[in-house]
UniProtKB/Swiss-Prot annotation:
Residues 1-18 form the signal peptide. InterPro entries: ANF_lig-bd_rcpt, Glu/Gly-bd, Iono_Glu_rcpt_met, Ionotropic_Glu_rcpt, Iontro_rcpt_C, NMDA1-like_ligand-bd, NMDA1-like_N, Peripla_BP_I. It comes from Mus musculus. It is a multi-pass membrane protein. The keyword S-adenosyl-L-methionine does not apply. One of its GO terms (biological process) is regulation of long-term neuronal synaptic plasticity. It catalyses: Ca(2+)(in) = Ca(2+)(out); Na(+)(in) = Na(+)(out); K(+)(in) = K(+)(out). Glycine binds at residues 516, 518, 523, 688, 732. Disulfide bonds join 79-308, 420-454, 436-455, 744-798. Heterotetramer; the NMDAR subunits are modular and harbor tiered domains that function in concert to regulate opening and closing of the cation-selective ion channel pore. Forms heterotetrameric channels composed of two GluN1/zeta subunits (GRIN1), and two identical GluN2/epsilon subunits (GRIN2A, GRIN2B, GRIN2C or GRIN2D) or GluN3 subunits (GRIN3A or GRIN3B) (in vitro). Can also form heterotetrameric channels that contain at least two GluN1 subunits and at least two different GluN2 subunits (or a combination of one GluN2 and one GluN3 subunits) (in vitro). Residues 19-559, 648-812 are extracellular. The keyword Ribosomal protein does not apply. This is Glutamate receptor ionotropic, NMDA 1.
Length: 938
């Protein structure tokens, strides 16, 4: 009997245990709904989920309450009616009320404190995306800011690039603005203007007047119903709701009071099933059921808290369950596919695109979550237009930014009266100048501030032409930082911003860049370039080595060794001619014995002959007579002809033509490819050339060298080349060729590389880009660009000299004139020597003649005395005495000069030797004359 009882007890225990193991787990789901009707819908949705997922071993249990008008009451109800039931999640609706009494905020705060997930059903406010406030909040609808994605897609479909964003300065407006700006940034675009107003403001006229002055005609509005109504009324008064305008708004802006004042033609959005609370209840229950099933398959799952009892009752599995919910993908939803993003908002949502026609909203398209599908034939645009507005108006007042870069843009200070000085081009036409504001770099030493200045040049003439052709006015200013534009890091972060003219254009400070801006890929990613108005490349500027002529420049054709050999040859040949003619038996060609010896070739004549043949001066006398000497003379003449011809050819090369200089051969020159501190080259900082060298891997070595020496502007670098501080400057060929043509000490060298062009820069969304390119192409065709090129770029001063026939100057031939002057001085010096020598020789001859005359008289007198003749004639006696006295005084003067000489130099000894024989004879004669005279007197 006891055994039977034991078996019965075991059977009952096993059956109860099996029943417990087979029973599904009860999962409570809470809900805070707007009405009792929606509570019933919630319970039905839970039952449908249990039937649909009966095999999941879970059973959902519905626990719900309705909204309370008081936040404290609502929080207490959540604790007492829902959390106390150990709910895994709470669904909450957001019924529209005038003062928004039925907000889900108390539910979100209370459940979030205990980490219980909350699923919003119709809550659209963007504040619930902030997870620092609403920690566990998810929703099956997107926030209002999600409408920015639809606006952005409509901009893409209709090619609207000019927009004005008009938003209220509250959380909703800022969220919409942030999302739209993020999308525009991905498209490398931006709103032309963002206008904000305070919520509840009653006067937005000034704000709309500012919008009316902009180019954009597409206005995107994000505001509450009442604020939207205020904007619509002001826009109607300013005639901003008519033809040409486009108004894109969201769901609030075409609801309630806003719809009463909304203009016909406005385009709004309505979330499909956005207010269908029952549909969202069904989808939310399905998402929770799927997430609970996934959660229970994990380990270490704890049950939700039972009631609101301090902070020790926080659900530890709550954050995990929230992550499971956020990763859920519920494809069978009534409202479509349900997924959540990282903020817990619904990722994909469908919208109806509504058009207000005759005060009624008409659906004219849909947004399927990724693309806009419009029905253009049904759309009536503002002003009753059926054609899509272009979305902008052509502003007739453009802000032009440029940069000082001659010859494209000259910058000069204005006169005292604020006007520009009148000047004329090389063609005699007046220079067209415009007033441009910018830093006063033209006044060194003065404080740097913006002042009116005069701008003119190639680009200014082009701007005037474009303005006249396309009917716009302009105001010109110089770029503030003096740079063309490159990207640089902001505060050492990864974010980069453009500086220079590029930065001013992209930031809206300028509408157009009219300057020698190089077209390159990096810039073209951010701005729109026109067709090139000037094709060019990069080249290298160096200083020209001007040859300096010296006094011995006429001797440069021959080396000093050759000159020495030529001079030696002249004298050797002269001596050989003299010797050959002297020793040749036929050298004198004496016809008879009476021919004088002076007719023969002397050494002096031989020298004259040798120099005369070499210098081609003609031979008047002293030609060799012997055949052997004449053979040598002919050979010497041939030698002289070759020497003179070679000298003449080389003289022209040295004096007339420029010497070939050792310049840079181009970008591949070894001095550039293998940089050193002995050869410095550079370009302009943060320019297109700098970008080019930085991007080219094969030029990295050159870039590292240049980076240390780059200059702030091209003008500074060019001056550094002239001052020998920089050996080579790499820059745009158009600019450097012009500088080399104006400054004759500079020259460009090497072939062009990195060929590109100069273009006019505009923003990507500029309405002028097509017209500007067409105008430039027409200017090329009709020769206007060629005329500008001749007037400004090809106007040269140095080339006219270099292309003219080369002529010799006094500087080249100064040495020759000095040679002539030296010959004159030498001739004058020698003539004095010749005169002195001649006088000395004549004095000696006269003395000899007197001596011989005295001797003859004495001899005659002596013969007369021996023959016994009478006393000599008194006249003869007087003559004899005069001769003897003259001779005596002459001899005395010679002796006194001899005694006063310094020790009897070598010249005196030689003179004594030359005159020793006749002097002794004269002395003997003098002694005899004195004896005769004493004898006669006695």
């Amino acid at each position: 009997m006891s055994t039977m009882h034991l078996l019965t007890f075991a059977l009952l225990f096993s059956c109860s245990f099996a029943r417990a193991a087979c029973d599904p787990k009860i999962v409570n789901i809470g809900a805070v709904l707007s009405t009792r009707k929606h509570e019933q819908m919630f319970r039905e949705a839970v039952n449908q989920a249990n039937k649909r997922h009966g095999s999941w071993k879970i059973q959902l249990n519905a626990t719900s309450v309705t909204h309370k008008p008081n936040a404290i009451q609502m929080a207490l109800s959540v604790c007492e009616d829902l959390i106390s039931s150990q709910v895994y999640a709470i669904l909450v609706s957001h019924p529209p009320t005038p003062n928004d009494h039925f907000t889900p905020t108390p539910v979100s705060y209370t459940a979030g404190f205990y980490r219980i997930p909350v699923l919003g059903l119709t809550t659209r406010m963007s504040i619930y995306s902030d997870k620092s406030i609403h920690l566990s909040f998810l929703r099956t609808v997107p926030p209002y800011s999600h409408q920015s994605s639809v606006w952005f897609e409509m901009m893409r479909v209709y090619n609207w690039n000019h927009i004005i964003l008009l938003v209220s300065d509250d959380h909703e407006g800022r969220a919409a603005q942030k999302r739209l700006e993020t999308l525009l940034e991905e498209r490398e675009s931006k709103a032309e203007k963002v206008l904000q107003f305070d919520p509840g403001t009653k006067n937005v006229t000034a704000l709309l007047m500012e919008a009316r002055d902009l180019e954009a005609r597409v206005i995107i509005l994000s505001a509450s119903e009442d604020d939207a109504a205020t904007v619509y009324r002001a826009a109607a008064m300013l005639n901003m709701t008519g033809s040409g305008y486009v108004w894109l708004v969201g769901e609030r802006e075409i609801s309630g009071n806003a719809l009463r004042y909304a203009p016909d033609g406005i385009i709004g959005l309505q979330l499909i099933n956005g207010k269908n609370e029952s549909a969202h209840i069904s989808d939310a229950v399905g998402v929770v059921a799927q997430a609970v099933h996934e959660l229970l398959e994990k380990e270490n799952i704890t049950d939700p808290p039972r009631g609101c009892v301090g902070n020790t009752n926080i659900w530890k599995t709550g954050p995990l369950f929230k992550r499971v919910l956020m990763s859920s993908k519920y494809a069978d939803g009534v409202t479509g596919r349900v997924e959540f993003n990282e903020d817990g908002d619904r990722k994909f949502a469908n919208y109806s695109i509504m058009n207000l026609q005759n005060r009624k909203l008409v659906q004219v398209g849909i947004y399927n979550g990724t693309h806009v599908i419009p029905n253009d034939r049904k759309i009536i645009w503002p002003g009753g237009e059926t054609e899509k507005p272009r979305g902008y108006q052509m502003s007739t007042r453009l802000k032009i930014v440029t940069i000082h870069q001659e010859p494209f843009v000259y910058v000069k200070p204005t006169m005292s009266d604020g006007t520009c000085k009148e000047e004329f081009t090389v063609n005699g036409d007046p220079v067209k100048k415009v007033i441009c504001t910018g830093p006063n770099d033209t006044s060194p030493g003065s404080p740097r501030h913006t002042v009116p200045q005069c701008c003119y040049g190639f680009c200014v003439d082009l701007l005037i032409k474009l303005a006249r052709t396309m009917n716009f006015t302009y105001e010109v200013h110089l770029v503030a930082d003096g740079k063309f534009g490159t990207q640089e890091r902001v505060n050492n972060s990864n974010k980069k911003e453009w500086n220079g003219m590029m930065g001013e254009l992209l930031s809206g400070q300028a509408d157009m860049i009219v300057a020698p801006l190089t077209i390159n890929n990096e810039r073209a990613q951010y701005i729109e370039f026109s067709k090139p108005f000037k094709y060019q490349g990069l080249t290298i500027l160096v200083k020209k080595e001007i040859p300096r002529s010296t006094l011995d420049s006429f001797m440069q054709p021959f080396q000093s060794t050759l000159w020495l050999l030529v001079g030696l040859s002249v004298h050797v040949v002269a001596v050989m001619l003299y010797l050959l003619d002297r020793f040749s038996p036929f050298g004198r060609f004496k016809v008879n014995s009476e021919e004088e010896e002076e007719d023969a070739l002397t050494l002096s004549s031989a020298m004259w002959f040798s120099w005369g043949v070499l210098l081609n001066s003609g031979i008047g006398e002293g030609a060799p007579r012997s055949f052997s000497a004449r053979i040598l003379g002919m050979v010497w003449a041939g030698f002289a002809m070759i020497i003179v011809a070679s000298y003449t050819a080389n003289l022209a090369a040295f004096l007339v033509l420029d010497r070939p200089e050792e310049r840079i051969t181009g970008i591949n020159d070894p001095r550039l490819r293998n940089p050193s501190d002995k050869f410095i080259y550079a370009t302009v900082k943060q320019s297109s050339v700098d970008i080019y060298f930085r991007r080219q891997v094969e030029l990295s070595t050159m870039y590292r060298h240049m980076e240390k020496h780059n200059y702030e502007s091209a003008a500074e670098a060019i001056q550094a080349v002239r001052d020998n501080k920089l050996h080579a400057f790499i820059w745009d060929s158009a600019v450097l060729e012009f500088e080399a043509s104006q400054k004759c000490d500079l020259v460009t060298t090497g072939e062009l590389f990195f060929r590109s062009g100069f273009g006019i820069g505009m923003r990507k969304d500029s309405p002028w880009k097509q017209n500007v390119s067409l105008s430039i192409l027409k200017s090329h065709e009709n020769g206007f660009m060629e005329d500008l090129d001749k007037t400004w770029v090809r106007y040269q001063e140095c080339d006219s000299r270099s292309n003219a026939p080369a002529t010799l100057t006094f500087e080249n031939m100064a040495g020759v004139f000095m040679l002539v002057a030296g010959g004159i001085v030498a001739g004058i010096f020698l003539i004095f020597i010749e005169i002195a020598y001649k006088r000395h020789k004549d004095a000696r001859r006269k003395q000899m003649q007197l001596a011989f005359a005295a001797v003859n008289v004495w001899r005659k007198n002596l013969q007369d005395r021996k023959s016994g003749r009478a006393e000599p004639d008194p006249k003869k006696k007087a003559t004899f005495r005069a001769i003897t006295s003259t001779l005596a005084s002459s001899f005395k003067r010679r002796r006194s000069s001899k005694d006063t000489s310094t020790g009897g130099g070598r010249g005196a000894l030689q003179n004594q030797k030359d005159t020793v024989l006749p002097r002794r004879a004269i002395e003997r004669e003098e002694g005899q004359l004195q004896l005769c005279s004493r004898h006669r007197e006695s």
